[in-house]
Amino acid sequence: MELPILKANAITTILAAVTFCFASSQNITEEFYQSTCSAVSKGYLSALRTGWYTSVITIELSNIKENKCNGTDAKVKLINQELDKYKNAVTELQLLMQSTTAANNRARRELPRFMNYTLNNTKKTNVTLSKKRKRRFLGFLLGVGSAIASGIAVSKVLHLEGEVNKIKSALLSTNKAVVSLSNGVSVLTSKVLDLKNYIDKQLLPIVNKQSCRISNIETVIEFQQKNNRLLEITREFSVNAGVTTPVSTYMLTNSELLSLINDMPITNDQKKLMSNNVQIVRQQSYSIMSIIKEEVLAYVVQLPLYGVIDTPCWKLHTSPLCTTNTKEGSNICLTRTDRGWYCDNAGSVSFFPQAETCKVQSNRVFCDTMNSLTLPSEVNLCNVDIFNPKYDCKIMTSKTDVSSSVITSLGAIVSCYGKTKCTASNKNRGIIKTFSNGCDYVSNKGVDTVSVGNTLYYVNKQEGKSLYVKGEPIINFYDPLVFPSDEFDASISQVNEKINQSLAFIRKSDELLHHVNAGKSTTNIMITTIIIVIIVILLSLIAVGLLLYCKARSTPVTLSKDQLSGINNIAFSN
């Protein structure tokens, strides 16, 4: 009788979701900033998980005694096969309970050293599974340890003496009851399947009568359907080390999940949000194997509590921004590293750097605050003015101009450098745009794919309005000679400080070089002057010598009268 109602509800939900999606997607806007090679997608609303709601789910089991019916009837054989599967499932759950208890205990000891998490302690029991399987359990629990801490706390209490009987008694006359556990916490418990009464009071009496013959095949089918849920739950817990996520429809059917949401102590708006997005709720929920005891299988379902809803959210997309010099290897690059989801939260901003951890449904963003950082609202200034003095924007630098594309909500950012060919195409018209070197943006209007080299990107087809904000690429403001490379976790101020240090070093080097050159110049001048003086003196001496020599050559010889008389007399005397 429930199936037609579920179909009607499903159709209504789908129509409402389609209408909501079409209406809300019109509010999405996107702004591309050419100066920083980044884009901001706006118009989203928040659904931030701030806590957990835990509930205990039970399945009543039958302690099947030896079935004495071994007839040859085909339907009886099918029943016996299902009973064997049932017994094997119960045995597997019992072994799994031991292994997960021990794994939880070991995870509690290892978490402080590996992840600084603390899990609630559980009673140590013997583990009959292989070491490889135990290591798999431990690794899984280490990965989700902090997320399931509250669920493990409830699961631990169920292992105390009398807790299972307390739940079993509360569910004798109803399928849902609030039970106060020994630790003082009240939890909602639900019985989703009663295999005990069905097997003991309906199935086995039919099988064991009339010479072990079953005339109605519906009996076989009914048991297979009921047993299948237990078998699937066992399989999921076994494969996933006792902790499963998302919560499957075997753990909780849609009607059971909606009923549980309706009983949660939250506002009507929160209930409506969760009821309209049950698939997202399932993805962010956990099922935790607890105990099988007193003919009861009990497991904990941990659902998210969305304490922050309907606040504005936006997503930042970034891509490398490089210079476009033709000389290979001479370019410098800068990339904003603050990409991710942002949501307003109580006067500040919750930042989710791993955008893939958030789930988007239409214009609704479901994120877990455990994965967030709290930032001041001034972080928004980085989008319009990356050099603003109120918030130090985060960047990384390099000297490798790699071409790539980033798909945004309403288009694509294309970083095209070197000899890479970058194009945008329409499936009917072919290439409609070829990108030149640099960072550019294309909206999804009339564009189906973006190609960068040999890589093909498919753009989103979400409706909305795109805005291209032009501006001088900030990378052009930097000198390649002093630009710091390979800064992977830096900020604008840190990069500028390193540039200033480099410039100061260059200035100091120039001053030292100037002083050295000045000293060398003075010495050279003195040496040159001395040489010139020596040369002048030598030239002067040579000039004086030549002058005296020439003067001596040009002066006539004169003799006195006595000398002439003597000469003449001597001459005449001969």
Curated annotation (Swiss-Prot):
<feature type="lipid moiety-binding region" description="S-palmitoyl cysteine; by host">
    <location>
        <position position="550"/>
    </location>
</feature>
<feature type="disulfide bond">
    <location>
        <begin position="313"/>
        <end position="343"/>
    </location>
</feature>
<dbReference type="GO" id="GO:0019031">
    <property type="term" value="C:viral envelope"/>
</dbReference>
<comment type="similarity">
    <text>Belongs to the paramyxoviruses fusion glycoprotein family.</text>
</comment>
<feature type="transmembrane region" description="Helical">
    <location>
        <begin position="525"/>
        <end position="550"/>
    </location>
</feature>
<dbReference type="InterPro" id="IPR000776">
    <property type="entry name" value="Fusion_F0_Paramyxovir"/>
</dbReference>
<keyword id="KW-0325">Glycoprotein</keyword>
<feature type="coiled-coil region">
    <location>
        <begin position="158"/>
        <end position="209"/>
    </location>
</feature>
<keyword id="KW-0732">Signal</keyword>
<feature type="glycosylation site" description="N-linked (GlcNAc...) asparagine; by host">
    <location>
        <position position="116"/>
    </location>
</feature>
<keyword id="KW-1168">Fusion of virus membrane with host membrane</keyword>
<feature type="glycosylation site" description="N-linked (GlcNAc...) asparagine; by host">
    <location>
        <position position="500"/>
    </location>
</feature>
<keyword id="KW-1162">Viral penetration into host cytoplasm</keyword>
<keyword id="KW-0812">Transmembrane</keyword>
<feature type="coiled-coil region">
    <location>
        <begin position="76"/>
        <end position="96"/>
    </location>
</feature>
<feature type="site" description="Cleavage; by host furin-like protease">
    <location>
        <begin position="136"/>
        <end position="137"/>
    </location>
</feature>
<feature type="glycosylation site" description="N-linked (GlcNAc...) asparagine; by host">
    <location>
        <position position="70"/>
    </location>
</feature>
<feature type="glycosylation site" description="N-linked (GlcNAc...) asparagine; by host">
    <location>
        <position position="120"/>
    </location>
</feature>
<keyword id="KW-1160">Virus entry into host cell</keyword>
<dbReference type="GO" id="GO:0060141">
    <property type="term" value="P:symbiont-mediated induction of syncytium formation"/>
</dbReference>
<keyword id="KW-0165">Cleavage on pair of basic residues</keyword>
<keyword id="KW-0564">Palmitate</keyword>
<feature type="site" description="Cleavage; by host furin-like protease">
    <location>
        <begin position="109"/>
        <end position="110"/>
    </location>
</feature>
<protein>
    <recommendedName>
        <fullName>Fusion glycoprotein F0</fullName>
    </recommendedName>
</protein>
<keyword id="KW-1169">Fusion of virus membrane with host cell membrane</keyword>
<dbReference type="GO" id="GO:0044178">
    <property type="term" value="C:host cell Golgi membrane"/>
</dbReference>
<dbReference type="GO" id="GO:0046718">
    <property type="term" value="P:symbiont entry into host cell"/>
</dbReference>
<dbReference type="GO" id="GO:0098670">
    <property type="term" value="P:entry receptor-mediated virion attachment to host cell"/>
</dbReference>
<dbReference type="GO" id="GO:0019064">
    <property type="term" value="P:fusion of virus membrane with host plasma membrane"/>
</dbReference>
<keyword id="KW-0449">Lipoprotein</keyword>
<keyword id="KW-1032">Host cell membrane</keyword>
<dbReference type="GO" id="GO:0055036">
    <property type="term" value="C:virion membrane"/>
</dbReference>
<feature type="disulfide bond" description="Interchain (between F2 and F1 chains)">
    <location>
        <begin position="69"/>
        <end position="212"/>
    </location>
</feature>
<feature type="disulfide bond">
    <location>
        <begin position="382"/>
        <end position="393"/>
    </location>
</feature>
<keyword id="KW-1180">Syncytium formation induced by viral infection</keyword>
<keyword id="KW-0472">Membrane</keyword>
<keyword id="KW-0261">Viral envelope protein</keyword>
<keyword id="KW-1133">Transmembrane helix</keyword>
<feature type="disulfide bond">
    <location>
        <begin position="358"/>
        <end position="367"/>
    </location>
</feature>
<keyword id="KW-1043">Host membrane</keyword>
<keyword id="KW-1161">Viral attachment to host cell</keyword>
<keyword id="KW-0945">Host-virus interaction</keyword>
